[in-house]
Regions:
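C-terminal cap of thioredoxin/glutaredoxin-like
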Residues: 5-25, 99, 103-183
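Structural alpha/beta surface segment adjacent to cysteine/selenocysteine redox centers
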Residues: 4, 8-111
Length: 183
């Protein structure tokens, strides 16, 4: 379970293909709305707790170095990810899913784009090969809305309280820093 607003989700995303190759596991990507999870569970973003946010910034940078991936704090964080996550729900199970997810994570956590700004978001979509108007139609469809809501509710029902959260069978692992246990 992931949300584009979570830098830890981005870091986990960069590693999961390797986990799948090494273990033979199939990764099932589950877009959820992290704000909905926080509301349902009474949790909050680490960014809302100054000391925790400062620590997490340093920790995320350490993990990016360990993983050998680009990572930059987004100067526009926090970002409302509702439309982006509906887009992920709309593309789930299609060939467009991974290119879309790649583009959104890159925009958020490598390029530091303001994805709440419509012209900026449209530019990111165009650069990734998506038609912004077609994207909005898909993201605003009732099917995408219902799918994202259902996945978010499923996450809460399974005990998810943050992102990323990975399940191996019924075993839950929270955070990108638990991938060694996932593997």
């Amino acid at each position: 379970f992931f949300d584009f607003g979570s830098p830890a989700s981005y870091l986990a995303y960069t590693q999961m293909d390797g986990v799948a190759k090494r273990t033979g596991a199939e990764i099932v990507w589950r877009p959820m709305l992290l704000g909905g999870v926080f509301k349902a569970t009474g949790n909050a973003s680490p960014a809302m707790v100054p000391a925790k946010g400062k620590w997490m910034n340093a920790d995320l940078a350490r993990f990016a170095r360990r993983y050998g991936v680009d990572f930059n704090r987004n100067p526009f964080f926090p970002v409302n990810t509702l439309v982006m996550m509906r887009g992920a729900a709309a593309f789930e199970g299609t060939p467009q899913f991974r290119p879309y997810v790649d583009a959104m994570f890159r925009a958020m956590w490598v390029d530091g784009k303001n994805m709440n700004d419509l012209p900026t978001a449209a530019g990111v979509l165009k650069a990734a090969g998506f038609d912004p108007a077609d994207f909005m139609a898909k993201a605003e469809s009732q099917g995408a809305k219902d799918r994202l809501k259902a996945t978010t509710e499923e996450a809460v029902a399974r005990g998810v309280f943050g992102a990323p959260t990975t399940f191996v069978g019924d075993h839950m692992f929270f955070g990108q820093d638990r991938l060694d246990f996932v593997e």
